[in-house]
Curated annotation (Swiss-Prot):
Its cofactor is Ca(2+). It comes from the Eukaryota. Snake venom phospholipase A2 (PLA2) that shows anticoagulant and neurotoxic activities. PLA2 catalyzes the calcium-dependent hydrolysis of the 2-acyl groups in 3-sn-phosphoglycerides. Binds 1 Ca(2+) ion per subunit. Keywords: Calcium, Disulfide bond, Hydrolase, Metal-binding, Secreted, Signal, Toxin. This is Basic phospholipase A2 2. Residues 1-11 form the signal peptide. GO terms for cellular component: extracellular region. Its main location: secreted. It is found in: Secreted. It holds the Pfam family Phospholip_A2_1.
Amino acid sequence: LVAVCVSLLGAANIPPQPLNLKQFKNMIQCAGTRTWTSYIGYGCYCGYGGSGTPVDELDRCCYTHDHCYNKAANIPGCNPLIKTYSYTCTKPNITCNDTSDSCARFICDCDRTAAICFASAPYNINNIMISASTSCQ
């Protein structure tokens, strides 16, 4: 029993592997001035899922990012929601560093492009938490 407790204590000191979405959140904050939470529920595509026509330029950024992740998922063994990658942030510049892992590089490029797009697109407060049934046709 003591051996089990000691091994569990040792395992508790191992930091969790960051997931891709955490990296994407950090990239968003590197490229722009808004926090990633500003984009949850924005338009028809920012946040989980999406449908219809994007309502503005920022929503198109989310639409494009969603489709980029769909393309990444077509790479054998590539899961864009959990695959991590290497990048450098020198605010506001982002550089993807993976060269040998095509999945990691593809996802990093998806996230980098979206983060830069978010930073440059106008933010319309009226497009937060809109009704999908009426606005996302």
